[in-house]
């Protein structure tokens, strides 16, 4: 994807669509943004005439003087935020691709709640790139999707002095979006492809690309070293467990952050077998591990001034003649013993070994990322995640 930054107006011509935003009104949009759109009365009449009101992510495509304009709803003006700008860009990018456009112009609009141009530019590029994400690796595109590919996104700033800021912000957004896409590809991959060994190989490739230190401890050595939590979960699978450590250590780093990721590449529940309905979704149980890999990619690419350690316990949780059973007692890496009552509570077992291993780095902060319990979905639905911490300052920073 090519990303350009222009002043005043973006490119025009065949295959180009200009995107504007609109604040929601009662019967018609309250106001178009940016200022150039708000001052275009003819465009305003065309948009209102199409029955468009400006509700969040509502779209309308109108032609005017040989050009195409895609207007996306921002909702009420009082609710404007960078997240709304991000959603606008994602909605616009998907709509533009679906309609066969090759290039899209996104305005870096000036509205008081949004702050400086750099923050707006980053939100727009993040939204556009993440909105365009599709997992196409294992599917044949249907005819109506073939050949439809957005090639260029142009950020249009109002003042020349904003070019440098917007360009740097767009680059950062691109790095973040690439890391998220890496994680999404791993999460979406089927479990017969994304095995524990596959995750280990991904970590090795990332380490080679970004000059990270990578350590992979195989199953046989985990048994000898006393990783009882991971070994107990892994012993029922034909795919050997992998304990993965990635280290990003910049010069003069004074702080150390550790991220532990649950990497259950398929969770059948083990002997305490899950219901058949939606069991295919249990390939997602390695989402924490995928997120850790994406986090290390971002840290190293952006050259963050802190040490970042990623720790991943990658295994399957399967029923077999060698699987752990309810009533078994395991000795974890910390030396504590655990009685297994339900083998489908495997997440806390593998994470206990990860977290104890993390202590050797004497971290300033530890974050574990895991699809640990369906109770979170019951309580919070798909709109929020569960976050637990004793450190209120850390919670506030993570919520940003």
Language-model features: locations:
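Short amphipathic alpha-helical segment within the helicase RecA-like ATPase core
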Residues: 1-263
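A generic structural signal for tightly packed, nonpolar segments enriched in small/aliphatic residues
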Residues: 57, 183, 200-400
